Swiss-Prot record:
This is Flagellar hook-basal body complex protein FliE. GO terms for biological process: bacterial-type flagellum-dependent cell motility. Keywords: Bacterial flagellum. The gene is fliE. One of its GO terms (cellular component) is bacterial-type flagellum basal body. It comes from Pseudomonas fluorescens (strain SBW25). Its main location: other. It comes from the Bacteria. One of its GO terms (molecular function) is cytoskeletal motor activity. Belongs to the FliE family. PANTHER family: FLAGELLAR HOOK-BASAL BODY COMPLEX PROTEIN FLIE (PTHR34653:SF1), PTHR34653. InterPro entries: FliE (IPR001624). It is found in: Bacterial flagellum basal body.
């Protein structure tokens, strides 16, 4: 019986929050500027992250191969798959960028 009371109280609280949210005027605040990073900077950071992931995976695999204690095969495989997926995603981004560049270059002026 107490669960029903708690549920009803929860529903009443949710409805009151909904009414409060609907009653308040909505204003759109401009997004705070966080240093204006360029697309090239963001792409460079993504490439560095992929590189770091691959290096960490390689180091973990080497540690497992030499029999270092505390390194499990599952950890090695998960790290390897993370590196593989991140590299594949980066490759797809590169392919899309190349395709977009080619499309722009083929546009009539």
């Amino acid at each position: 019986m107490s669960q029903g009371i708690e549920f009803n109280r929860l529903m009443l609280d949710m409805r009151s929050m909904q009414m409060d949210a609907m009653a308040q005027p909505k204003s759109v605040a401009p997004a705070p500027e966080l240093g204006q990073s360029s697309f090239a900077d963001m792409l460079g950071q993504a490439i560095n992250k992929v590189s770091d992931t691959q290096q960490a995976s390689s180091q973990l695999a080497n540690a497992f191969e030499i029999g270092k204690s505390g390194v499990d095969l599952t950890d090695v495989m998960v790290a390897s798959q993370k590196a593989s997926v991140s590299f594949q995603a980066l490759t797809q981004v590169r392919n899309k960028l190349v395709q977009a560049y080619q499309d722009i270059m083929q546009m009539p002026v």
